[in-house]
């Protein structure tokens, strides 16, 4: 829906890399990309490099154009599986995962992460450098640590520091709910683009409006009757 309404790109919801969990109607629907506008970017989560590599291959066989690795989810049920943002505490394992997935597929591999595990361990820039050196094609960084969850305001200094260290595309994420904020974040961080997450809930027009206004065009949100 966001793509249809003007977003430049959309990424799937996080899908666990364990293919034994894919045999449900919900999972089957996630693997069906009929009539979806490309590029199709599928986000995978897990902790086992081989399992993630196998999942990446399976998604490509089902039509994925991009594989996105999740290092950002802060949910406890994901952390209990040592996946999502929990991986940021194990840089050696992250490197193994990056290598395995990049070697497994012939499509671009990207990563979504947080700035670090907690405010005293903001190792996002280090992992972003690792991603670039191991062949990933883009980094999306949310401006909070895992321990921050979604509390307080996103901080963009770590994203700016990351921009100074890598040359691959960097996408800033966190609290971007207007064109003014998007423009300021891109200016302050040097990010190549912004990603909008929670801001689209109930407002799928937001990404298209921001994209249009950043390009110097005007796009008006439809009236309430049309939205309903």
Where are these regions (language model features)?
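Flavin-dependent oxidoreductase catalytic cores
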Residues: 1-228
């Amino acid at each position: 829906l966001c793509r249809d309404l003007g977003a430049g790109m959309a990424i799937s919801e996080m899908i666990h890399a364990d293919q034994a969990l894919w045999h449900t109607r919900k999972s089957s629907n996630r693997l069906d990309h009929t009539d979806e506008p490309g590029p199709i970017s599928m986000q995978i989560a897990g902790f086992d490099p081989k399992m993630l590599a196998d999942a990446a291959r399976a998604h490509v066989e089902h039509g994925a154009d991009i594989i996105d690795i999740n290092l950002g989810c802060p949910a406890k049920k994901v952390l209990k599986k040592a996946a999502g943002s929990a991986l940021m505490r194990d840089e050696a394992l992250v490197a193994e995962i990056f290598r395995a997935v990049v070697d497994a597929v012939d499509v671009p591999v990207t990563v979504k992460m947080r700035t670090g595990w907690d405010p005293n361990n903001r190792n996002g820039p280090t992992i972003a450098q690792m991603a670039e050196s191991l062949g990933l094609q883009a980094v999306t960084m949310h401006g909070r640590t895992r321990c921050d969850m979604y509390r307080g305001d996103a901080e963009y200094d770590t994203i700016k520091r990351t921009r100074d260290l890598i040359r691959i595309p960097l996408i800033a994420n966190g609290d971007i709910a207007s064109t003014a904020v998007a423009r300021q974040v891109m200016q302050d961080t040097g990010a190549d683009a912004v990603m909008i997450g929670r801001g689209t809930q109930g407002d799928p027009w937001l990404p298209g409006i921001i994209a249009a206004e950043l390009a110097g065009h005007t796009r008006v949100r439809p009236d309430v009757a049309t939205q309903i």
